[in-house]
Amino acid sequence: MELKTEEEEVGGVQPVSIQAFASSSTLHGLAHIFSYERLSLKRALWALCFLGSLAVLLCVCTERVQYYFCYHHVTKLDEVAASQLTFPAVTLCNLNEFRFSQVSKNDLYHAGELLALLNNRYEIPDTQMADEKQLEILQDKANFRSFKPKPFNMREFYDRAGHDIRDMLLSCHFRGEACSAEDFKVVFTRYGKCYTFNSGQDGRPRLKTMKGGTGNGLEIMLDIQQDEYLPVWGETDETSFEAGIKVQIHSQDEPPFIDQLGFGVAPGFQTFVSCQEQRLIYLPSPWGTCNAVTMDSDFFDSYSITACRIDCETRYLVENCNCRMVHMPGDAPYCTPEQYKECADPALDFLVEKDQEYCVCEMPCNLTRYGKELSMVKIPSKASAKYLAKKFNKSEQYIGENILVLDIFFEVLNYETIEQKKAYEIAGLLGDIGGQMGLFIGASILTVLELFDYAYEVIKHRLCRRGKCQKEAKRSSADKGVALSLDDVKRHNPCESLRGHPAGMTYAANILPHHPARGTFEDFTC
């Protein structure tokens, strides 16, 4: 018998030759390069073609990997029909912040300069520009002789002197059913005291609509009360040159930001606002720039751009003026009229118009907005002017200058989804690489595993030949001893070669009386 060599025992089975591996490999062209033939032009051409294909493959794969790490995205647009839609919140503000009749002597004393009704000497600045009736009332209120001022609070002033929805609202219908001022919730914005219809707050359910078109939404008739507008004798942030209302249509999940996002509605017109709900889905970094985390704010629970802006503006004013405006959340003290004039209004104007770095709000990953199309017609017509004047006990001129109708509805009962999607995902990358591997070198993932497996066997064998595995093998042999199988022993044929062994190696007859006289080793194996 030929015993195994020490090298075979230590190093294991020697791996097959490169020619044998190439002939059985699934990698195309490898068998022609590593063949048993002598070096020839054919083998050289095969090697050249293989290396060229491999180079092209590496270039294409590199380009695909670079494209993947550019994180491109595409935008998918779809329209989805719905059986019903949640009607949006509608916030409206009169462009005049304070009613002239509600400004008291104490209000005029504290806020007269802020409203440009008085100068810094508590005097009416330009009596020639004033209406005679208003001037008479104002002169009486501006007489501060023996007047003892009382404490003044801007929040209370805005709430008391702002326009009342119960006086403004002449008619209200939602889906053909009557609604009232009780369906409007008071909300403060930079325009002062405003009102939100269908706010979804205070335990009230969000209203839904079942059809599109006029008559299936909100229709209101308002009196803007121009007779109550403050006289304008100067330019301040609290005075308005316009007449009408400002309207914002928004989701119930975000606060109104009407001074930046609202649209105007003029008296003397019926304005039709056709809406379409749009649901926007943006991708977070690195494919997009949306904010996927919840808002870290003490004032708002859910993140939105308007909530972020209001939160940022509030913090900015508190840091710079040590107070907050009436429409801002929090527990900081309200600004006084002097702080409004000297600090709050200039600081907020600077922040909104010029500072592009302080209040930078990222787009939320999920957003609902409402696309709008506006159209309008003149009211009242000549045929209806007298009727409306009689109905509301006003003159025809008053009706034309103060009455407006606002009609908000869904154009159709569907919503539009605008969704960002990854243009190239990891599955696409692997598919492209796999396809190019199959095209250029005829390889697959299993082919790559074949190459790694063969390389592992070759490296392992060579390391063991250099003695790096022998120490472990010798240590193992010293611990365990040499283990021979029964077949290995029999192949030495001890029964024939050791029959004439000296008697000193035989068993004693009294131990094995019926056994032939053989040596211990022969007896065991035979």
UniProtKB/Swiss-Prot annotation:
**Any GO CC annotation of this UniProt entry:** cell surface
Effect the entry attributes to changing S83P? No effect on pH-gated monoatomic ion channel activity. Increases desensitization rates
* Mutation effect (N106P): Activated and inactivated at lower pH
GN (gene name): Asic1
Membrane topology term reads: Multi-pass membrane protein
The protein in question is named Acid-sensing ion channel 1
Gene3D superfamilies, A to Z:
acid-sensing ion channel 1 domain (1.10.3590.10), Acid-sensing ion channel domain (1.10.287.820), YojJ-like (1.10.287.770)
Site entry: Involved in proton-dependent gating: D355
Annotated phenotype, changing F100L: No effect on channel activation and inactivation
Any one GO MF annotation of this record: monoatomic cation channel activity
Reaction catalysis annotation: Na(+)(in) = Na(+)(out); Li(+)(in) = Li(+)(out); K(+)(in) = K(+)(out)
Regarding tissue, the record states: Expressed in dorsal root ganglia and sciatic nerve (at protein level). Widely distributed throughout the brain. Expressed in olfactory bulb, neo and allocortical regions, dentate granule cells, pyramidal cells of CA1-CA3 subfields of the hippocampal formation, habenula, basolateral amygdaloid nuclei, and in the Purkinje and granule cells of the cerebellum. Diffusely detected over most other regions of the basal ganglia, including thalamic nuclei, substantia nigra, striatum and globus pallidus, hypothalamus, midbrain, pons, medulla and choroid plexus.
Q: Which InterPro entries match?
A: ENaC, ENaC_chordates, ENaC_CS
- Residue numbers on the Extracellular membrane side: 67-425
| List of glycosylated residues | N366, N393
What does the record note on quaternary structure?
Answer: Homotrimer. Heterotrimer; with other ASIC proteins producing channel with different properties. Interacts with PICK1; regulates ASIC1 clustering in membranes. Interacts with STOM; alters heterotrimeric ASIC channels activity.
**Entry function:** Forms voltage-independent, pH-gated trimeric sodium channels that act as postsynaptic excitatory receptors in the nervous system, playing a crucial role in regulating synaptic plasticity, learning, and memory. Upon extracellular pH drop this channel elicits transient, fast activating, and completely desensitizing inward currents. Displays high selectivity for sodium ions but can also permit the permeation of other cations. Regulates more or less directly intracellular calcium concentration and CaMKII phosphorylation, and thereby the density of dendritic spines.
Q: Which Pfam families match?
A: ASC
Q: What is the effect of changing L85M?
A: No effect on pH-gated monoatomic ion channel activity. Increases desensitization rates
